[in-house]
Amino acid sequence: MSEKKLIWAQDFDLPAGSAPDSSIWARDLGDGSDYGIPGWGNNELQVYTNQNAFVNSQSQLEVEAKRVVDGSAGDAYYGPAQWTSARLVTKNKVYFQYGQIEIRTKVPRGKGLW
């Protein structure tokens, strides 16, 4: 069995409040309707925005879900959006053909969180 070799890492060593590095991370915005998959294919209730992902003071990526009650998030496939969040992807930016991907994450308990 061969020894594992690290070929890429993302440590988020950016100033607090910074957006994730756009040379690595792209954002999907909206509710999926623009991609032909309203609710992103699994009835997600949030609308993805540019404001809900940032680097915190511990150099960690923070993705924040926010409840919206004033209609300021715009419309979702089901009506006025009630939640905003962020959707980050590495599509067309970082590639892996084989191997193992490891991530350390903290996710709170609750409906719709995974």
Which residues are covered by each model-predicted region?
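Conserved kinase catalytic-core segment
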Residues: 114
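Low-complexity, Ser/Thr/Pro/Gly-rich disordered linker/stalk regions
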Residues: 1-111
